[in-house]
Amino acid sequence: MQKFKMVNHSKWVEMLGMKYWGFLLTMFSLMVLPAGILAEVGVDSRKIVLGTHQPLSGPMKNYAQIGRGASIYFQYLNDQGGIHGRQLFLLQRDDRFKPQRTLKLVEELVMKDRVFALFSGIGTETSESAMPLLKSQGVPHFFIGSNARRITEPPRHGIFSMLPTPEVEARVLGQYVNSNHPGEKVILWFRDEPEYKAASKEIAQKLQGNPLQFLPSKAGSSQFKAEWEAIQAGNPRAVIAIGPYAPLIKFLRAADVSGTPIYTGNALADSNLWRMLDSRIINRLRVLTSFPLLIESNHPGIRLHRALLREYAPDFKPSRWSIYGHSVAELMAEVLRRSGRDLTREGAIRSAENLKSWRGKLMPPVYLDRNQHLSMSFLRVSRIMPTKVVHLSEWLDGR
């Protein structure tokens, strides 16, 4: 005859009760913890922590104004309630523009300070030095301060750049010159370096209907007077000049004070241009612009920028680089805003990749997707005068 084991009724009831309360505790944890303990690294219910590497000291310390401009804008946002109720904190580290130092500091930001993301690190080699670490830890780097094509082409997951590449600038310049000098002879001066050789090909592609003469300037050469003599002998109706900032300025200083228009890139988009070049040469210049310039005093973004500096940093003189910092912070804030309250690194990357022709108070139109990780691809052709800027074109797409 089969024997049946007697069940302790009170123990069975107790066990069911424990399971019931355990179930309730689990459900409660799932509802509460995502805003705190289970949140993404660098995020809790009250704050988002970003990190950046900047040359806060040394010969490149002027770029430190970018980080300060960004911090001021974040402080302003925090006083408005932050992003989805969270305050923004930016941890700035001084890498002195040295890649080995950058890697050490980024490792501390990621492993010790546990930042949500890197934001607006300055420099190509400096930023590249930390990319293997960021990839291994799943940390994105939003809006690197570099104009190097290799940062975003081909696109890398979680890596976004800020500044227009020489190729982007070349497409815009070629597009504008083709429209405004149809069939006319153009001479293209460019520094004989890989990125500017590639850019010269982009210009040639846009100017297939124009007689085009190439004038490469050897790296390290300072024969700028002779180069201008060759340009004059060629008798062009327009000159395009592209190259790194330092040799480009020296080349322009050697130009005659009168002559055909000279088209150049975004490097010279500065309110202080009149201090660098003879005003008569500036009259010949057509420059690619992105952010509004300080002399555009009636621009809403410039008015806001000056007001924020008066409020939060009265000792801080506004500059091209403080505007840059404000602008890139505005872009970062938009990405975080679109990511929602349940903020994750992957969610922020997706939000960045879905910015379609977005514009801020200072930023030009931004178009990003999975294959386009370069933020500034829309530029305008402008004339910069001592007291005003005249925009000669609408926003032109350099993608």
Language-model features and meaning:
Residues V49, N62-R68, Q80-E153, S217-F224, ...:
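Beta-alpha junction/loop-to-helix N-cap segments that form part of ligand/metal-binding clefts
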